[in-house]
Amino acid sequence: MADVRNPTKNHHGHHHLHALLIPYPFQGHVNPFVHLAIKLASQGITVTFVNTHYIHHQITNGSDGDIFAGVRSESGLDIRYATVSDGLPVGFDRSLNHDTYQSSLLHVFYAHVEELVASLVGGDGGVNVMIADTFFVWPSVVARKFGLVCVSFWTEAALVFSLYYHMDLLRIHGHFGAQETRSDLIDYIPGVAAINPKDTASYLQETDTSSVVHQIIFKAFEDVKKVDFVLCNTIQQFEDKTIKALNTKIPFYAIGPIIPFNNQTGSVTTSLWSESDCTQWLNTKPKSSVLYISFGSYAHVTKKDLVEIAHGILLSKVNFVWVVRPDIVSSDETNPLPEGFETEAGDRGIVIPWCCQMTVLSHESVGGFLTHCGWNSILETIWCEVPVLCFPLLTDQVTNRKLVVDDWEIGINLCEDKSDFGRDEVGRNINRLMCGVSKEKIGRVKMSLEGAVRNSGSSSEMNLGLFIDGLLSKVGLSNGKA
């Protein structure tokens, strides 16, 4: 049963648009959706934001609160909040049982969403726009059933979207879906420079494409071809040719970076884990002397790799803050770090379960970021001008590494061969990064990122305006208005 919190009367704003936002229920998707909700509400659009019961329970620690209550009372923005079942009990271990969770999202979640949408459409001020995560397989079907404008929000790079969008071309050319895939360059995707197959998303490199995640990707990218608009958390200056090529197929708007680069989202809690505040510890360290380490909210690291990285950190002798999620190896692996690691590190480092990443990255003592290369992390580290040490684990992270190291030159690889690396290589590359490699170039890339949102007539603000104009036109037509 859906739970809808609707504490404010609808004051529309001048747009008469009411958008339902539905993120894929993972931390890295919820975060940009929250920031998008505030961005749209700031334009006068009424927003109803949907979390699953599980995500809501994790964020609120089991309370019955509305995560937007604070920002709504401070700003007056018309953001409502609803929760819906993902088809599994709240207490089910989604990290340990990843495939079961994804299967529920593929086969069961749709029915709960449809029930919620049915309760929110119709009448004056009802929902008339649905903005759903691209990884859902049903948005165009639900939108068509209820007469909604359908928008897909892609929370990753446009390059990754384009490679998935053109899976048919990859199949035809033998670069995907074959027992023996080709290893030569992929040079036929519109708007995409020649790319090595090893730099495509991990799911595009696998020969067995029968997994539940592959089923989701296949169906989602069939569905996205039927939506009205696509929003993308990137900027025009980063991926201009790719975006222009996609625009010949579907209205595709780069409106990034959608990250918490100011305090407007400070009152919205989005973290699935309790955050540790390490500001006081960071205050004791010299400028640019601390390596921040985090492998994100979703992917797992093998115990073997984690041990080598830990010893490499000790060998490097650098100061560090290391986020070690409780389930970083597995939910049933309670102590993944080598015995005596924290004792040997002493005051040089702290290990924490989770933190506010932007708070750490923006601290002047932080001079490097060892990351899994999740897209949110890449945008945030560019914004904070912190060079990157790349250790991609899966999915789009592999392609993001290419952008960071090969194209933009704002970081280096932790290791050259992820299947065979050791602590000595880790220690050497940590020291290379902390000696200032890539610092100058990341400053230039930051200027592009900042320019996309801060300057008058900037690309992302202009694209957002074009998107809203498109929504008004679609809603006006469907409502019989001029």
UniProtKB/Swiss-Prot annotation:
<feature type="binding site">
    <location>
        <begin position="394"/>
        <end position="397"/>
    </location>
    <ligand>
        <name>UDP-alpha-D-glucose</name>
    </ligand>
</feature>
<comment type="similarity">
    <text>Belongs to the UDP-glycosyltransferase family.</text>
</comment>
<dbReference type="InterPro" id="IPR035595">
    <property type="entry name" value="UDP_glycos_trans_CS"/>
</dbReference>
<dbReference type="Pfam" id="PF00201">
    <property type="entry name" value="UDPGT"/>
</dbReference>
<keyword id="KW-0808">Transferase</keyword>
<feature type="binding site">
    <location>
        <begin position="355"/>
        <end position="357"/>
    </location>
    <ligand>
        <name>UDP-alpha-D-glucose</name>
    </ligand>
</feature>
<keyword id="KW-0328">Glycosyltransferase</keyword>
<dbReference type="GO" id="GO:0035251">
    <property type="term" value="F:UDP-glucosyltransferase activity"/>
</dbReference>
<feature type="binding site">
    <location>
        <position position="297"/>
    </location>
    <ligand>
        <name>UDP-alpha-D-glucose</name>
    </ligand>
</feature>
<dbReference type="InterPro" id="IPR002213">
    <property type="entry name" value="UDP_glucos_trans"/>
</dbReference>
<feature type="binding site">
    <location>
        <begin position="372"/>
        <end position="380"/>
    </location>
    <ligand>
        <name>UDP-alpha-D-glucose</name>
    </ligand>
</feature>
<protein>
    <recommendedName>
        <fullName>UDP-glycosyltransferase 86A2</fullName>
        <ecNumber>2.4.1.-</ecNumber>
    </recommendedName>
</protein>
